[in-house]
């Protein structure tokens, strides 16, 4: 049977390790990087609190939702790069963040997951990602040389 898109929340006998590639994050030693889609002002696009993801900032959410059946919940919701690029709209930014496996609160299906703590490393270049066109530089007009 093709169960693509099926909601199996609460189904018995389902082993998420067979279906959720992001569970590999739990086995990673040391620092792990992921992505955060933010508004133009670096604020979180969701309404769980005024979190701002500026470079160098360490964010914490001690009371993050640990229920993996909740796609989006209280906490610092991060994503894969394909997810962030797919959900990106004009005026938004994509940030690279760093965390550890111990910081992970929940890993639902779908390309997103929640952490309790992360540090913002850098802002990704939207031109390099192919999400926006490069800004055209104005052409320099050369002044003709005046004969002496």
Per-segment meaning from a language model:
Residues 1-14:
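A detector of tandem-repeat and repeat-rich interaction/domain scaffolds
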Residues 6-9, 52, 71, 126:
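Compositionally biased, low-complexity repeat tracts
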Residues 8, 43, 59, 113-114, ...:
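Polar low-complexity intrinsically disordered regions enriched in Ser/Thr and small residues
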Residues 15-73:
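Long, positively charged binding patches that form subdomain-scale interaction surfaces
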Residues 61-124:
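ADP-ribosyltransferase catalytic core
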Residues 117-139:
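Long, highly charged low-complexity segments enriched in Glu/Asp and Lys/Arg with interspersed Ser/Thr
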Residues 139-145:
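Arg/Lys-rich low-complexity patches in intrinsically disordered regions that function as generic
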């Amino acid at each position: 049977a093709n169960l693509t898109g099926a909601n199996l929340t609460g189904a018995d006998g389902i082993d998420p390790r067979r279906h959720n590639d992001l569970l590999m994050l739990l086995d990673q030693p040391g620092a792990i990087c992921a992505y955060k889609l933010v508004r133009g002002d670096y604020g979180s696009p969701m309404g769980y609190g005024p979190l701002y993801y500026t470079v160098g900032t360490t964010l914490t959410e001690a009371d993050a939702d640990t229920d993996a059946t909740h796609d989006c919940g209280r906490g610092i919701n991060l994503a894969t790069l394909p997810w962030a690029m797919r959900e990106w709209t004009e005026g938004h930014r994509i940030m690279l963040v760093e965390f550890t496996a111990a910081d992970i609160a929940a890993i639902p299906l779908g390309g997103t997951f929640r952490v309790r703590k992360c540090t913002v490393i850098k802002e990704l270049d939207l031109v390099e990602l192919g999400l926006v066109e490069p800004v055209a530089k104005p052409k320099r007009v050369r002044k003709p040389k005046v004969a002496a």
